[in-house]
Amino acid sequence: MSLFRDDGIVLRTQKLGEADRIITLLTRGHGRVRAVARGVRRTKSKFGARLEPFSHVDVQFFSRGSELIGRGLPLCTQSETIAPYGGAIVTDYARYTAGTAMLETAERFTDHEGEPAVQQYLLLVGGLRTLARGEHEPHLVLDAFLLRSLAVNGYAPSFSNCAKCGMPGPNRFFSVAAGGSVCVDCRVPGSVVPSAQALVLLGALLTGDWETADACEPRYVREGSGLVSAYLHWHLERGLRSLRYVEK
């Protein structure tokens, strides 16, 4: 029997029995963790209010073994709020749909429980904080998060130099299968010809150049979002359900 303490973001919850929930979190030290929180669905439970999606929490787990992830699910025995991002996110449709896509993305990129994913965790914390504060348009925050998540997981797209031969850009064509921008000689069937403005935007989002990103015209933001969605779909092998609501 062991106690573990960590901080994490609540990704989702699901009902268990009459009063309990299974809480899925992305934690700093243990990656994705599923744990049982007992009694949190009772009306008077203050504990349950802290364990809602988007919440940044300090949690204590109880495991029957010497490791957090082992036989059966650990119990979530304590929780303290670090930052209640959900309060500012769920009241705005654009923020909510973008935030939901961010949570789903983080879970998809951390499919093995108990494996630390510190970079993904830090990206999610920063993304939700930015979204909750309303510092930039939700679509831009989401696309920046998606691009950086792809990058930290080894799928960084190229938006200038050729992704196949390295020819200096800008290059005219773009292929999700090839890894981003490609030159004339390296283009493959299915390559598209995006606007230069959309590629500049995506490069800015990937590198954190918010001055350039915030100044981009809406039509190029929409075009860029389409490229990000297609690129993410290719590498995850199936799309995000939550992106359908963002696109609406």
UniProtKB/Swiss-Prot annotation:
Q: Which domain of life is it from?
A: Bacteria
HAMAP family the UniProt entry points to: RecO
- Extract the InterPro entries matched here: ARFGAP/RecO (IPR037278), DNA_rep/recomb_RecO_N (IPR022572), NA-bd_OB-fold (IPR012340), RecO (IPR003717), RecO_C (IPR042242)
Q: Which GO terms describe its biological process?
A: DNA recombination; double-strand break repair
This molecule's function is given as: Involved in DNA repair and RecF pathway recombination.
Gene3D superfamilies linked: Nucleic acid-binding proteins, Recombination protein O, C-terminal domain
Q: Tell me which UniProt keywords the record has, alphabetically.
A: DNA damage, DNA recombination, DNA repair
Cysteine pairs bridged by disulfides in the record: none
Pfam families, from UniProt?
RecO_C, RecO_N
Q: Name one GO cellular component term.
A: bacterial nucleoid
Among SUPFAM superfamilies, the record links this protein to: ArfGap/RecO-like zinc finger, Nucleic acid-binding proteins
This chain belongs to the protein called DNA repair protein RecO
UniProt family annotation: Belongs to the RecO family.
User: Any transmembrane segments, and where?
Assistant: none
